[in-house]
Amino acid sequence: MSKKVAVVTGSNKGIGFAIVKGLLRRYDGVVYLTSRSEERGRTAVSQLKELGLNPEYHQLDVTDRESVLRFREHIKRSHGGIDILINNAAIANSAQLYNSHEENEEIININYKSILTIQELLFPLVRNNGRILNISSDCGHLSNVRNKYWIERLSRQDMTVNDINEFVEWFLKESRNGTFKKEELADDATAAAYRVAKVALSALTMLQQNELAARNISVNSMHPGLVRTDMTQGVGFYSADQAAETPIYLVLDAPQNLKGAYVWFDRKVLDWYDYNADYYFKSKTLNG
């Protein structure tokens, strides 16, 4: 019988690196550290080997279809499938709370559109009874959206990926045209593209769960808390190792029937649809 396989995208540093480290200490199987930059990935692998841990490594740029295809072929050839897939590769809004259109496009591509590619190319490799975890954010709760039309469309029981994609494209069009209004999103639309991407990802998670339910694969999204990483410029309440605890719980210990959920860093399952809730990201928390 082939060994079980866990894959963590964007895992050469921060939460992803901490998740790989935690899995290597607990998971009875192969754990893949992946990164866009092979050099940085190999450095991260060396750091883990110094701790007596032994990850596998493969280059993976989630925004590059050819890179994802190469990774897919490697996994098929070497292992035949994946048992745990953690979609962690992400980029925030750099140091600014407001961004140029080009930055907005990059943020959307990495945090949302790349997941569509992963879904198309890697989800078929996830074995029956496997687990998929999308690392979202408090920016990913529906309460980040203030536009009533989009709240309604994203709350529909018959929501499709087309609804989510149109939400994302609406934002990009408004951004490109300079017509986006700050009242469309919470907190004066700070980190707007990141909010839009993570809301889209959290919504997509529920559709992914529906598609994979017949194979008893659990798909969840989660907010890891404000973590001290490069992405938050070192601001945060938790270390990366602490933040990795709930993601590791969700893929190793949570009941298999926890499916399609939006989970907070304290393992509490939240009502994602409660758009009046106080779960949205507040930029003042970045002031430490």
Regions found by a protein language model. Give the residues of each.
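Conserved NAD(P)H cofactor-binding loop of Rossmann-fold oxidoreductase domains
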Residues: N88-A95
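Conserved glycine-rich Rossmann-like NAD(P)H-binding loop of the short-chain dehydrogenase/reductase
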Residues: Y27-T43
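Rossmann-fold cofactor-recognition segment
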Residues: L48-E66
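Canonical Rossmann dinucleotide-binding motif of NAD(H)/NADP(H)-dependent dehydrogenases/reductases
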Residues: M1-Y32
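Short alpha-helical oligomerization interface
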Residues: A95-N109, D188
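C-terminal helical subdomain
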Residues: T117, S221-M222, T229, Q233-K284, ...
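Catalytic loop of short-chain dehydrogenase/reductase
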Residues: E105, R131-A213
